[in-house]
């Protein structure tokens, strides 16, 4: 027989303990005592910080801003947490993508062009033939990212970089919000 006990240490700390056989409750209590955090290991209080990057794009493409985001995160002095990145536009977007083989960027852009071509019949064309496809590409790639912060660094893979995807043909000034929650 398997028995489940919920052991509460205080209002903020509870554990599910699985025990079986004779004296299940006694073993569950022993396990809970081992799992109880010591007062010295109390978690650091959460902090948060936010900033806005302004990125000038020369036109369509993937424009890396990993260095700028990483430098800002380092200035915050947090060891662990979560960075949320948000693009404040509907015709640009964000992605985490290959940072070594640049031909990947061309392949991604050509794929997006096939998914949302300029020569389709869109009702919304007030700002030109590249406007509605830019909105659709933004939907496909998204406007927010979440990146864990571990040991004071963004937990990006070796070949990963943070990119603003510019979907319009002409140069734009784009705004990207950084929000870090951590300790």
Can you describe what each PLM-predicted range is?
Residues 1-4, 10-16, 20-22:
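Short, low-complexity, charge-dense intrinsically disordered segments
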Residues 18, 25, 29-183:
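Active-site histidine-anchored catalytic micro-motif
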Residues 7-8, 41:
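Short helix-onset patch at the extreme N-terminus, typifying the N->h transition
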């Amino acid at each position: 027989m398997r028995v489940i006990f919920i052991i509460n240490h205080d209002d903020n700390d509870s554990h599910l303990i699985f025990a079986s056989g004779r004296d299940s409750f006694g073993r569950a209590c022993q396990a809970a005592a081992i799992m109880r955090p010591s007062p010295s290991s109390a978690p650091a209080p959460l902090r948060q910080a936010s900033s806005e990057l302004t990125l000038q794009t020369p036109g369509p493409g993937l424009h890396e801003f990993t260095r700028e985001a990483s430098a800002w995160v380092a200035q915050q002095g947090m060891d662990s947490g979560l960075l949320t990145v948000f693009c404040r536009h509907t015709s640009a977007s964000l992605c985490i993508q290959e940072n070594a083989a640049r031909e990947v960027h061309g392949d991604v852009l050509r794929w997006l062009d096939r998914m949302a071509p300029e020569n389709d019949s869109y009702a919304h064309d007030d700002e030109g033939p590249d406007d509605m496809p830019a909105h659709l590409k933004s939907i496909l790639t998204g406007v927010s990212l979440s990146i864990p912060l571990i040991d004071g660094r963004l937990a990006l893979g070796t070949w990963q970089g943070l990119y603003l995807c510019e979907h319009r043909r002409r140069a734009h000034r784009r705004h990207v919000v950084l929000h870090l929650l951590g300790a």
